[in-house]
Amino acid sequence: MSSESRENEVKAETKDEIANDGSPQLNGDNNIQSSDGHNDENEESLSRKRDSSGATVGDLKQEEKESMPKKEPEPTVKKIRGSGMPPPQQKYCLAIVRQLKRTKNSAPFKVPVDPIKQNIPDYPTIVKNPMDLGTIEKKLTSYEYSVPQEFIDDMNLMFSNCFLYNGTESPVGSMGKALQEVFERQLKQLPDAEQPAAAPVKKSKQKSASTAPPRTRRNSSVSSTSASVAASTAPKAASPAVLPEGKPRRRKNNSQMRFCSTVLKELYKRQYESFAFPFYQPVDPVACDCPDYFDVIKEPMDLSTIQSKLNKNEYSTLEEFESDILLMFNNCFTYNPPGTPVHVMGRQLENVFKEKWEARPKFDDATLVKQQEAETDALFDNGEEEEALMSEEEINGAKFAAVDKQISMLQDTLEAMKAKKMNRMRKPRRRDLTKEYGPITYAMQNELAERCNYLSAEQLSNVAEILREEMPWLRDTDEIEIDVGNMKPEVFHRIYRYVCKPDADSSEPASPVLMPTKPEKKKGRVLSETEQAEKIRRLQQQLDRFAGKTSPTSPESNNAANVSDSESDNESESSESA
């Protein structure tokens, strides 16, 4: 074998080894060749070169290539921002999580559970796969979910962990159930995957074949890649059947629905919140303490339900929208009689609606035809989806706050009615009586105590009523002790004016106290304790005599009484002469 043929053989072996390694190679013209095939001319030249045994070098290398395991090229999958989830679904799921984190029931679910900080060391042994809203949001922002079902599974895992560890009746379990209801309500409007644009069948096949990943995805409500391939290969006549059902579509009377949306947003304005909040969400018979509501109202309606129907394009005419608004007001007026706070609020909101509704423009047939020609049946863009989602979420998020506000307002109204009733029963107080009449002296106290002994039954009843008004804790007692020394200044002055100076205060409906003329002479002298006791004993004896009783009294006591009377009379006369 010549040296020239030997060199060619070595070169051919080198080229084959490079080709087996899968790296690019250069031919004689410096053109890049892929590892999948050889140049036809090069293969023919190699087949002509034989070794000393008569075997073809190209045949030997071909056998080696066939015996080696073939490396299948990995399919190149083009993902959107690193995720298989379409952008509308990605954006909607992220908006759901962020809205849930803003609700008041999301506090236990915002961050991962810390068993040490929360003093629940058995949590990791019970909950094997913890999950929280913060982790789900992080996975959404890093595009770790390929289909919405993976996101839904993580949300359901979070709620299942809550119910597993806390139960459904505990405070945390109740918060989890409320949060799950909001999530499931918002999930119903999850948009479907974007459908491929209308294109020739061959191009759609090539595109779907090059971008479809070979792995199997979970079943979900969203159309998968295989479904999109089937839709692209289906006849054009069957294409409307595979359009997403849950996706809102533009109505041909879009201008009318836009006006309805404007009116509804007007009713949600802050300036009408004081009388519009009872209509923001459906009536809760338990929270509003009206268990017979659904027995009276057969078709309940509220603004949040109307907003939801408007977002789903369930209204086709203005009359349908107006009918639901009027139904809401009629329900209010049917259940709440005239004069009640909710009835008055309903009338105020109805006037606002009528004012806005009368200003609606005229939608003639020619205008609708032009709109039908100008507008397409394309799906909502992402901005409109997010706006509709946020409006729905804001309504749902304000549900509990509005209910609490309504209950608080009704309680305040009840307290105001009770206070008004009590004010009618009370008489106006006179303040600053201490400054007006001066300090309370010991002589004033003795005078009041002495005059109270001569009050009639009606006057004593009036004094007791004054004490009950000034001292509420005495209202439930039948017997009231008049303690002159421990009275408040305003109470003392009021009773003192009533008993001792009935003519000085014309506002008090008091009759003058009938007092005997003799005790007036003793005004300048204060009796001692012994004299007061003796006087009480004498009065008791007089009462017994009037009642027909005879009390055994010793002559010594009678003499002592006569002596004390003469002494007291002499002292009083001497004080008057002085």
Curated annotation (Swiss-Prot):
The modification Phosphothreonine is found at residue 225. Component of the SWR1 complex which mediates the ATP-dependent exchange of histone H2A for the H2A variant HZT1 leading to transcriptional regulation of selected genes by chromatin remodeling. PROSITE patterns: BROMODOMAIN_1, BROMODOMAIN_2, NET. This is SWR1 complex bromodomain subunit bdf1. SUPFAM superfamilies: Bromodomain. Residues 22-36, 550-563 have a biased composition (Polar residues). Belongs to the BET family. Keywords: Activator, Bromodomain, Chromatin regulator, Nucleus, Phosphoprotein, Repeat, Transcription, Transcription regulation. It comes from Schizosaccharomyces pombe (strain 972 / ATCC 24843) (Fission yeast). Signal peptide: none annotated. Component of the SWR1 chromatin-remodeling complex.
